[in-house]
């Protein structure tokens, strides 16, 4: 018998199924916003039914989602809430636009309203964060702006009250409703993959760095976590394949549509897409062929005619198809445009055959605006018949094509062009009468101009078989070298040509290697920019972690306020004497140097924010690792990182320098402005708390007094929270210290719990001592005088 499934697992499965249904509805909304409104009018009954279901679902789930937001968020609950809000908002707007179109009949006005063309950009959200050190204003424009702000808020959680953080997170949530709640597909204007996320940083920390700094590696990083690439494969014959199985059509209509589709595809079928010779080169070859055809063995051979024949030999004998690089790297953007036109023509033909009208979709209604876009915008928008990978390959081929248009590379990559140019020069000289005479009985050319043209065209730049025979012929008998000054000059010229050819060949290889390396480096960015992107789980998970940390503070204060016994030292009489007594007794002692590493880790644990919780994982890492991720992800300056790392070691618990707070002014930031000074003051307060509790446990021998955070407790399956006894730092300036000295056996706060509120480290330690005194071996120390 199978084991029963737990209740949380069942709830999670139901939420996942619900999330899939809402995503499907959002996808339908996005399609109908861009579809011909006449088609949308035909779907009004189904659309209204879906809108009513979303209303009912939102009304039923909203109280539970709000309660969970105050308890413990999960990425699943965050995503579902965002989708529900977006589906409700945009579904109602689409219904209103369709009803307006039913009366007005204006297609352009419908798309202007549904696509928000007349409204300002919705992806600009101002965020205000109130901290103890002042107010911070930011603007969210990209998805990575949200992630960066959440990381910054996580780092500044020490100096941010829960109320201020909750208000700022609400503004972030409003931005995420339009950005993340709009379904799976990420709008291109929202994604900026050049900014690495926290997951990118963590991946680089566990991979080999090859001697490069983390900052340099991050600069070359293309983020694929906030948004993830989706492989899109387009079938060119999709319409032809699925049209025979379309429902709701008669056999006659289906047959007529198939016939029209086949006819349209046959009419729009283009060429083979292979490169063809230019008309100019073709005319030169025809002229040369005509001269050669008019000659026979009974006629005398002129030097020019012999040069033409030799050049035609090189043009005909060379295997150009296997050597040309242009075939592999030629631009194919025209072929993509032709494919788009073929797809559009086929779709329109089928629409006319089936419905008797051409549908006015968004891209057709605003076709003139789309046609006015430049090439970059058109590539980002994409097409219906070309996948992003096709566009990327076309762009890369265009890069090679542009690179190979330089004269040197063009002649090296396409040697036949040298022969074409030489042939054109010989024909021009023959036409001008420069080589019309000097009959020759079948020997090679002796005209210097024609010979040089032939050598440069066919041999000078590395044509097949060029150079070896001539060099042997120029050498004397027995290969003893040149015998005349003319032979020396000829050999020197041949050496120059050979060195030029070798240099050009090396230059070409280097140039193409550099271009290939550049293309490989930039291909990732091209793929991220042009491919279809879907939302990853980074943003919902980051938002949930940060929001849970601040919600835990408010929940902890609310739960402790309902304890059976609450002692509030913030306004109690006689607390000053307790403060003075405990302060004097602790300042007489020093922290054992052997304890400095452990209390340093305790300091890192309290300073670290709620986002990076590596110390709580199954394979836990020390607290300094989580703090390292926290400070590096916000770009903390090196001198501040050094100061933070040595904060505990600098004090060491010696003297009275570590006791920085005045009576009832612990975690007070009055008179301090600025994020960094306030953050440094918070570090001092936390150091004071750690050293004081360490000395307290050492002096009074009461065992280790636990310092805890309010977000250390996770809800149980019953929704209850367990807070073990200890001193809790709430990071709230009104009530920064809460001591739980007694609690129920299960660890939950209830009628048997005893809680102490305080704003002073030493007075709260004295209250803890009073409750521990009956259990101490010596009955405790005397109280204050």
From Swiss-Prot:
A zinc finger (C3H1-type) spans 197-225. Residues 433-452, 457-489 are annotated as: Disordered. Keywords: ATP-binding, Host nucleus, Late protein, Metal-binding, Nucleotide-binding, Viral genome packaging, Viral release from host cell, Zinc, Zinc-finger. GO terms for biological process: viral DNA genome packaging. Pfam families: PRTP. It comes from the Viruses. One of its GO terms (molecular function) is ATP binding. GO terms for cellular component: host cell nucleus. ATP binds at residues 696-703. InterPro entries: UL28/UL56. It is found in: Host nucleus. Belongs to the herpesviridae TRM1 protein family. Component of the molecular motor that translocates viral genomic DNA in empty capsid during DNA packaging. Forms a tripartite terminase complex together with TRM2 and TRM3 in the host cytoplasm. Once the complex reaches the host nucleus, it interacts with the capsid portal vertex. This portal forms a ring in which genomic DNA is translocated into the capsid. TRM1 carries an endonuclease activity that plays an important role for the cleavage of concatemeric viral DNA into unit length genomes. Associates with TRM2 and TRM3 to form the tripartite terminase complex. Interacts with portal protein. This is Tripartite terminase subunit 1. It comes from Human herpesvirus 1 (strain 17) (HHV-1). The lineage of its organism: Viruses, Duplodnaviria, Heunggongvirae, Peploviricota, Herviviricetes.
């Amino acid at each position: 018998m199978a084991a029963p499934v737990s209740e949380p697992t069942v709830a999670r499965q139901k939420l996942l199924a619900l999330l899939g249904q809402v995503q499907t509805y959002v996808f339908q909304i996005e399609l109908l916003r861009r579809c011909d409104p006449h088609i949308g009018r035909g779907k009004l009954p189904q659309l209204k039914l879906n809108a009513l279901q979303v209303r009912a679902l939102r009304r039923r789930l909203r109280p539970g989602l709000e309660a969970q937001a105050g308890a413990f968020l999960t990425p699943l609950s965050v995503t579902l809430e965002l989708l529900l809000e977006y589906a409700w908002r945009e579904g109602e707007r689409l219904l209103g636009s369709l009803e307006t179109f039913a009366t007005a009949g204006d297609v352009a006005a419908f798309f202007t309203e549904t696509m928000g063309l007349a409204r300002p950009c919705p992806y600009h959200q101002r965020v205000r964060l109130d901290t103890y050190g002042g107010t911070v204003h930011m603007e969210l424009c990209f998805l990575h702006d949200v992630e960066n702000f959440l990381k910054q808020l996580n780092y500044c959680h020490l100096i941010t009250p829960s109320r201020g953080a909750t208000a700022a997170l609400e503004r972030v949530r409003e931005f995420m409703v339009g950005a993340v709640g709009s379904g799976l597909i990420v709008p291109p204007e929202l994604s900026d993959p050049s900014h690495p996320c926290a997951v990118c940083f963590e991946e680089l920390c566990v991979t080999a760095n090859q001697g490069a700094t983390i900052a340099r590696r991050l600069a070359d990083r293309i983020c694929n976590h906030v948004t993830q690439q989706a492989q899109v494969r387009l079938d060119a014959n999709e319409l032809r394949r699925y049209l025979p199985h379309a429902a709701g059509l008669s056999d006659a209509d289906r047959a007529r549509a198939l016939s029209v589709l086949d006819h349209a595809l046959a009419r729009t079928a283009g060429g083979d897409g292979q490169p063809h010779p230019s008309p100019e080169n073709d005319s030169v070859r025809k002229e040369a062929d005509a001269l050669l055809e008019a000659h026979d063995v009974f006629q005398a051979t002129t030097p020019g005619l012999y040069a033409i024949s030799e050049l035609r030999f090189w043009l005909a004998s060379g295997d150009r198809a296997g050597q040309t690089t242009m075939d592999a790297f030629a631009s194919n953007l025209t072929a993509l445009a032709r494919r788009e036109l073929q797809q559009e023509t086929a779709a329109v033909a089928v629409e006319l055959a089936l419905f008797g009208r051409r549908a006015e979709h968004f891209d057709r209604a605003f076709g003139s605006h789309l046609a006015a876009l430049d090439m970059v915008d058109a590539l980002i928008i994409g097409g219906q018949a070309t996948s992003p990978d096709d566009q990327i390959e076309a762009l890369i081929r265009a890069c090679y094509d542009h690179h190979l248009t330089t004269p040197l590379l063009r002649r090296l990559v396409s040697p036949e062009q040298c022969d074409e140019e030489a042939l054109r020069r010989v024909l021009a000289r023959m036409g001008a009468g420069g080589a019309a005479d000097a009959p020759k009985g079948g020997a090679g050319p002796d005209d210097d101009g024609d010979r040089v043209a032939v050598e440069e065209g066919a041999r000078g730049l590395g044509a097949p078989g060029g150079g070896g025979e001539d060099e042997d012929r120029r050498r004397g008998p027995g290969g003893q070298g040149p015998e005349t000054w003319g032979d020396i000059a000829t050999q020197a010229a041949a050496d120059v040509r050979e060195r030029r050819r070798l240099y050009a060949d090396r230059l070409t290889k280097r140039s193409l290697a550099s271009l290939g390396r550049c293309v490989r480096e930039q291909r990732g960015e091209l793929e991220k920019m042009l491919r279809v992107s879907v939302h990853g789980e980074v943003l919902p998970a980051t938002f949930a972690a940060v929001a849970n940390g601040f919600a835990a503070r408010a929940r902890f204060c609310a739960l402790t306020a309902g304890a059976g016994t609450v002692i509030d030292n913030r306004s109690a009489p006689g607390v000053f004497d307790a403060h003075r007594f405990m302060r004097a007794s602790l300042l007489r002692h020093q922290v054992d140097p052997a304890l400095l590493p452990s209390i340093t880790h305790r300091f890192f644990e309290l300073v670290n924010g709620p986002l990076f919780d590596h110390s709580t994982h199954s394979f836990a890492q020390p607290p300094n690792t989580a703090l390292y991720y926290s400070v590096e992800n916000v770009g903390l300056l090196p001198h501040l990182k050094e100061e933070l790392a040595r904060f505990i070691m600098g004090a060491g618990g010696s003297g009275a320098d570590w006791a920085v707070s005045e009576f009832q002014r612990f975690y007070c930031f009055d008179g301090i402005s600025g994020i960094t000074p306030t953050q440094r003051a918070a570090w001092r307060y936390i150091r004071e708390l750690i050293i004081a509790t360490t000395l307290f446990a050492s002096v009074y021998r009461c065992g280790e007094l636990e310092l805890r955070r309010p977000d250390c407790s996770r809800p149980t399956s019953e929704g209850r929270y367990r807070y073990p006894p200890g001193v809790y730092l709430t990071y709230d300036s009104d009530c920064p210290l809460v001591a739980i000295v007694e609690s129920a056996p299960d660890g939950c706060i209830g009628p048997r719990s005893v809680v102490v509120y305080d704003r002073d480290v030493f007075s709260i330690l004295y209250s803890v001592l009073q409750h521990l005194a009956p259990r101490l071996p010596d009955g405790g120390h005397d109280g204050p005088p």
